[in-house]
Regions:
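Hot-dog-fold acyl-thioester-processing enzymes
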Residues: 1-84
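Hydrophobic beta-sheet segments that form the core/acyl-binding groove
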Residues: 82-122
């Protein structure tokens, strides 16, 4: 399916999330990562989330992308054939319980590909 390049640069709605200790510990436990950094809440520095927890925080956008696209004329039929292809993360500091995150994004590219059109979100 061909998608118009007019959507490049379109901002997504912001996702707000306040991180809880339960979320970070559940994620660490579910992935089998038992490092004290993620569970020992008596550490002077407190606990932190595993680095890949960042993917879990952003996942609601991928899961409900239509809720985050503001353009009424974005072709909704492509959503039913979407595939999460790749993710690229940059870490500047650990995520900690109590952090209030605002996840923002935009359509940064629409690229033709032999297997279908790639919609790149940044």
């Amino acid at each position: 399916m061909e998608i118009s390049s007019k959507f490049v640069g379109m901002s997504l709605k912001t996702l707000a999330s306040t991180i809880t200790w339960r979320q970070t510990m559940n994620y660490a436990a579910a992935t089998g990562d038992n490092q004290p950094l993620y569970f020992d809440d008596e550490r002077p520095e407190g606990i932190i989330a595993p680095p890949m927890f960042a993917v879990a925080v952003t996942w609601p956008i991928s899961e409900r992308i239509l809720d985050f696209i503001e353009a009424a004329d974005f072709p909704q039929e492509i959503i039913f054939t979407q595939v999460h292809y790749t993710e690229d993360l940059s870490f500047y500091r650990p995520i900690r319980p109590g952090d209030h995150l605002l996840i923002r994004g935009k359509v940064s590219a629409i690229l033709p590909h032999r297997s279908g059109t790639l919609v790149v979100l940044r």
